[in-house]
Amino acid sequence: MSNVPHKSSLPEGIRPGTVLRIRGLVPPNASRFHVNLLCGEEQGSDAALHFNPRLDTSEVVFNSKEQGSWGREERGPGVPFQRGQPFEVLIIASDDGFKAVVGDAQYHHFRHRLPLARVRLVEVGGDVQLDSVRIF
């Protein structure tokens, strides 16, 4: 098990067709966790994608952050995560957005608000036990 926060540098960035696969376990007492695709390694970097399962409020929020300001929140349908259960999330970059796949089902399509080419870091944190973070 990896510990969180987990950070993976992406010096080459990501491009359409890149797949990020996150496998882990939602702890029994989990409140929320996040996956961020950040545009830099420094604190406060812009976020091209903020994927935030919130078990405490039964929602999954998608957002972006630019120049310190969060954008408009989008929500996926229902919460495909359960406390005490393992999960697999695929985040697939395309020309027009990020497709989130949870388990075997497409979950939400988040349209790009920042250029995909700016992404330099994957960060996973919060209430989650990570098994692996892979980039294909």
From Swiss-Prot:
InterPro entries: ConA-like_dom_sf (IPR013320), Galectin-like (IPR044156), Galectin_CRD (IPR001079). Residues 6-136 form the Galectin domain. It is found in: Cytoplasm; Nucleus; Secreted. Induction: By p53/TP53. GO terms for cellular component: cytoplasm; extracellular exosome; extracellular space; nucleus. One of its GO terms (molecular function) is carbohydrate binding. Keywords: Apoptosis, Cytoplasm, Lectin, Nucleus, Secreted. Coiled coil: none annotated. Transmembrane segments: none annotated. PROSITE patterns: GALECTIN. Mainly expressed in stratified squamous epithelium. CDD domains: GLECT. Its main location: cytoplasm. GO terms for biological process: apoptotic process; heterophilic cell-cell adhesion via plasma membrane cell adhesion molecules. It holds the Pfam family Gal-bind_lectin. It comes from the Eukaryota. A beta-D-galactoside binds at residues 70-76. Monomer. Could be involved in cell-cell and/or cell-matrix interactions necessary for normal growth control. Pro-apoptotic protein that functions intracellularly upstream of JNK activation and cytochrome c release. This is Galectin-7. It comes from Homo sapiens. The lineage of its organism: Eukaryota, Metazoa, Chordata, Craniata, Vertebrata. The gene is LGALS7.
